[in-house]
Amino acid sequence: MGSLEAERKTTGWAARDPSGVLSPYTYTLRETGPEDVFIKIIYCGICHTDIHQIKNDLGASNYPMVPGHEVVGEVVEVGSDVTKFKVGDCVGDGTIVGCCKTCRPCKADVEQYCNKKIWSYNDVYTDGKPTQGGFSGHMVVDQKFVVKIPDGMAPEQAAPLLCAGVTVYSPLTHFGLKEISGLRGGILGLGGVGHMGVKLAKAMGHHVTVISSSDKKKEEAIDHLGADAYLVSSDATQMQEAADSLDYIIDTVPVFHPLEPYLSLLKLDGKLILMGVINTPLQFISPMVMLGRKAITGSFIGSMKETEEMLDFCNEKGITSTIEVVKMDYINTAFERLEKNDVRYRFVVDVAGSKLDQET
């Protein structure tokens, strides 16, 4: 264990206003406590939620803001009470960096549903300092919210699993779908989360149908990701033929869309699981749910326990995310491309290999 300092400075890339443009920003990290891990960041994935935050789409953004919550790095120092990690470990940190540890969700190891959870960025830590994310040189994180990256897993591949991976893994396990081989599942939307949904559901032995508004991703879905079928939601004939065929649908679409067409695809007792962050009320008519005893539910990222399970599952099954690695000075272009769905399927920033204090 090295000597922990009360204050350290690091440089990240921050948004200053709702334009969402990021540029170098040097700031002071929070004080390192006895249960904290000091991490040198190596890679950080880019998530669509980062766009919502830097552009104040949800109306709660505070600036300057360093985004990034798919963080993989190396442990540089550990606090005196840290028991889970040692210097040199390759570790990850996701969306949450704090919780109350006393409420019902916390005691049930689903701390992501704690009403007092602390986000990895755009939040305030218990010491009053703003939290800043993974597009930076270093982070200080409570050991509870850090996971070990399994041996043999490439760190750049691990980064998207900490959000996109566990976001899909959590409902598949919570709703008992993981253990039932042969289920017929639908993945609505083939982006960063959706492509992980295909890979994870297939590894669980499910028959997977990708649902998209056009056929432009059909070859990719079937030939490269291993989906069993592809359904074009704008084709009325295809949708009618697929009625009552799916046990569940994982809806990853982050923009407003009608639910009725997808409810019609579900079998009796089927589940429509919402995952996209949408700031517009969704609509459906109640008979679409009542007449098939169908359920519309949601799921939010995953717990630390689920994250550890998911990483082990992916390592065992050889599941990786499909990524494009970029340097930090490309991040604004990467955000622009992500908004246009011009990425296959997740950007990962090579933080350690970037000059954080320089713009192009």
Swiss-Prot record:
Gene3D superfamilies listed in its UniProt record: Medium-chain alcohol dehydrogenases, catalytic domain (3.90.180.10), NAD(P)-binding Rossmann-like Domain (3.40.50.720)
Bound cofactor: record note: Binds 2 Zn(2+) ions per subunit.
Reaction equation(s) it catalyzes: (E)-cinnamyl alcohol + NADP(+) = (E)-cinnamaldehyde + NADPH + H(+); (E)-coniferol + NADP(+) = (E)-coniferaldehyde + NADPH + H(+); (E)-sinapyl alcohol + NADP(+) = (E)-sinapaldehyde + NADPH + H(+); (E)-4-coumaroyl alcohol + NADP(+) = (E)-4-coumaraldehyde + NADPH + H(+)
Pathway: Aromatic compound metabolism; phenylpropanoid biosynthesis
GO function term, MF aspect, one: cinnamyl-alcohol dehydrogenase activity
Pfam families: ADH_N, ADH_zinc_N
UniProt cross-references to PROSITE patterns, sorted A to Z: ADH_ZINC
BP terms from Gene Ontology: lignin biosynthetic process
Family: Belongs to the zinc-containing alcohol dehydrogenase family.
Protein name, per record: Probable cinnamyl alcohol dehydrogenase 1
Source organism of the structure: Aralia cordata
